[in-house]
């Protein structure tokens, strides 16, 4: 589906055995309505992946570095509670991802979407470049830049209908 999940309707999509929503529900405001639609579309199973609690370490630390308020997405337990209140008793699994994110350059690290460059002014972007230069180190095997603070952390929420 090539549109935002919060904009889909059951009437235009119809029934499917499985609905998979990977990394597409973080930050959606009408989350309960979106979950109801997803649940209605699915005949057998729903699988959702969300950012886990460790996913935002580097962003949180950067905001502290520039003394800016951190505004994180609601954590996965928020969605779990909404599902529970809807009568859906979902399974939760934290996916064990071992690799750190790697970047070919500071620019790539800045532009990966994690830092929301569109919300930073020029001074904050310069501070971000400085911050990344301080914390990123080169992987001797791959030659790419990484930090232990920037590791993917994913939560799988699923249920059987």
Please place each PLM-identified region on the residue numbering.
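Hydrophobic/aromatic anchor residues within beta-strands of the central parallel beta-sheet
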Residues: 1-3
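Short, structured coil segments at secondary-structure junctions
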Residues: 41-42, 86
């Amino acid at each position: 589906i090539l549109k935002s999940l919060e904009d889909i309707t059951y009437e235009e999509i119809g029934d499917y055995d499985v609905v998979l929503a990977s990394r597409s529900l973080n930050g959606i405001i009408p989350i309960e309505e979106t979950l109801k639609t997803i649940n209605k579309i699915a005949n057998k199973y729903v699988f959702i992946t969300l950012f886990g609690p460790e996913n935002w370490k580097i962003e949180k630390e950067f905001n502290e570095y520039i003394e800016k308020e951190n505004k994180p997405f609601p954590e996965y337990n928020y969605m779990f509670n909404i599902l529970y209140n809807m009568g859906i008793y979902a399974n939760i699994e934290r996916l064990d991802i071992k690799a750190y994110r790697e970047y070919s350059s500071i620019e790539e690290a800045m532009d990966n979407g994690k830092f929301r460059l569109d919300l930073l002014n020029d001074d904050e972007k310069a501070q971000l470049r400085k911050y990344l230069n301080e914390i990123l180190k080169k992987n001797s095997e791959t030659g790419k830049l990484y930090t232990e603070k920037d590791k993917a952390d994913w939560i799988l929420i699923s249920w059987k209908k």
